[in-house]
Amino acid sequence: MGRKLCRGGLAVAACLIVAMAAACSSSSSTPASSSSASGSASPAASGAHGTLIVFGAGTLATPFTAEIAAFTKANPGVTVHSQFSASGDRVKAITQLHQPADVLGVADYSLIPKLMFPANATWYLGFVSNAITFAYTSHSKGASGLTADNWYKVLAEPGVRIGRSNPAADPSGYQTLQMLQLANGYYNKPDLSASVLKNSPASSVAETETSLIAALQSGQIDYLAIYTSTAQEEHLKYIPLPPQINLSDPTMAADYAKVSINAGSLGTLTAKPIIYGLTIPTSAPNAALGEKFISFVIGPQGQAIMRSNGFVVISPALANPQDKVPASIKPLTTQWPASGG
């Protein structure tokens, strides 16, 4: 009998935090979601005032909404405007559309140096990690016989419908393709990736995977390539993929790097552990407030919020290069290991 499938708990190796400590000693039809928040307490309670603009990956919408609520409660003089969509689109909004942002959070830290250095950003932090998986429901085709050992056979069955995000815009999109490439070798099935992807036509590809959750829950699709944190947030069943392929384990970075995929406008992308990145764009209209928010997110209260939303917290946050990080943030970070980001 196959291994029991997971519902709830994050299927990410606990060694992520240990490994980091040892090394250191969202198709374009889906619009960006946006919101604004302000504290309700007396402004006299805090010295922080002004407007803060936060851009984030689609998978950061839920935890960052909670972060913003806690931050504005502690800083009632601050009003926050936020927008969440595919990480690549958030980057392009800054670099190509010249939209103002004080904080940027992406689902793949490497997008910051690759697409923003040196003109639009000069440093970044790695602050949480995640894992890629396939979510499903009890009504998904083949779900009754699904195990952690036969998942790729079930997903390749005729009639199965698989949703995923656009690899040219969203990290989970290209990380899904990288995971499937790794699965080819791990299971010694050279055609595994192609067999699964034949059930994921262009009609089931969206700008962000979070925009397909309703389609999964309503039965329009059977499986959805998604992060384990999001599966937990939405109380979805998901497949506990092994760390050898789910991109969760930094100690396996060299093995992940053996595969790469063409992500269209993002270029050729080599697989790497899933580590979310933070930065303050060089054009930030309120960089000082951005520093306060990032310090909050990577501080104890902010870390607790990220953990409660299914993320693995990297503590202290990894900085690259640390000497470029603002002085107010630097004490909460450590230099990213030379072998890493």
Can you describe what each PLM-predicted range is?
Residues 19-23:
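C-terminal motif of bacterial Sec signal peptides marking the signal peptidase cleavage site
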Residues 1-13:
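Bacterial N-terminal signal peptides that target proteins for export
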Residues 129-130, 273:
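Short, solvent-exposed loop/turn segments at the edges of secondary structure
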Residues 87-120, 213, 231-235:
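Pocket-flanking alpha-helical
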Residues 124-127, 189:
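A short alpha-helix-loop-beta-strand transition element characteristic
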